[in-house]
Amino acid sequence: MINTKPPEIYALGQHISMSADKARRIIDRIRGRSYEETLLILELMPYRAAYPIFKLVYSAASNASYTLASNEANLVIIKAEVNEGPAIKKLKPRARGRCYPIKRPTCHITIVLKDISFYDSDSESVELNLLKKAR
C-alpha cells in the first residue's frame, strides 16, 4: 500500500536560553494559525521570546519549501510545543570567598507545519458534512 499522507515538516530548537513558561505564552497565540499570519503576529510582539520562535517558524517554512516544494501561503502550524530543557548552572562570586549558584532555564521548542493544499478535496467533503449536520 502506498503512503499518500503528506509528511509534516518541523523545526526543532533546543537549549534556547529562556524560561519555558515565557515561551509558552507566545506559542499559545500562534498555534493553529497560518504561516503568514504567524509572522505578522510575532513581528509585532514586544516579548524577547518572540524572536527565537520567529526564527523557528521561518526555518520550518524553509524546510517545507525545500522538501515539499510547497507555497508558503498554504502552510499552517498544526503543532507547537515547548518543553523544559536542562538548567545551565553557573556560580556567581560573592564577598569573602563565597559564591551563589545561578540556574539559567532553557527550553526546547518544536514547530510542526502542514501544507493544506494536499487536503483541498478532503476539506470540501468535511465542509459539506458540517453543513449537513447543521441542518
From Swiss-Prot:
The protein's location, in the record's own words, is: Plastid
Carries keyword RNA-binding? yes
Which superkingdom, per the lineage? Answer: Eukaryota
Biological process (GO) annotations held by this record are: translation
Protein family (similarity comment): Belongs to the universal ribosomal protein uL22 family.
- What SUPFAM superfamilies does this protein's entry cite? Ribosomal protein L22 (SSF54843)
Name the CDD domains on file.
Ribosomal_L22
Matching entries from NCBIfam families are given as: rplV_bact
What is the protein's given name? Large ribosomal subunit protein uL22c
Q: Name one GO molecular function term.
A: structural constituent of ribosome
Q: What does this protein do?
A: This protein binds specifically to 23S rRNA. The globular domain of the protein is located near the polypeptide exit tunnel on the outside of the subunit, while an extended beta-hairpin is found that lines the wall of the exit tunnel in the center of the 70S ribosome.
Q: Which organism is it from?
A: Cuscuta exaltata (Tall dodder)
- Statement: the UniProt record of this protein carries the keyword RNA-binding: yes
Q: InterPro entries per the record? A: Ribosomal_uL22, Ribosomal_uL22_bac/chlpt-type, Ribosomal_uL22_bac/org-type, Ribosomal_uL22_CS, Ribosomal_uL22_sf
Coiled coil ranges (UniProt) are none
| Keywords attached to this entry | Plastid, Ribonucleoprotein, Ribosomal protein, RNA-binding, rRNA-binding
Note the Pfam families from the entry: Ribosomal_L22
How this chain assembles, per its entry, is: Part of the 50S ribosomal subunit.
Q: What is its main location?
A: plastid
In the record, what lineage is assigned to the organism producing the protein? Eukaryota, Viridiplantae, Streptophyta, Embryophyta, Tracheophyta
One GO CC annotation? large ribosomal subunit
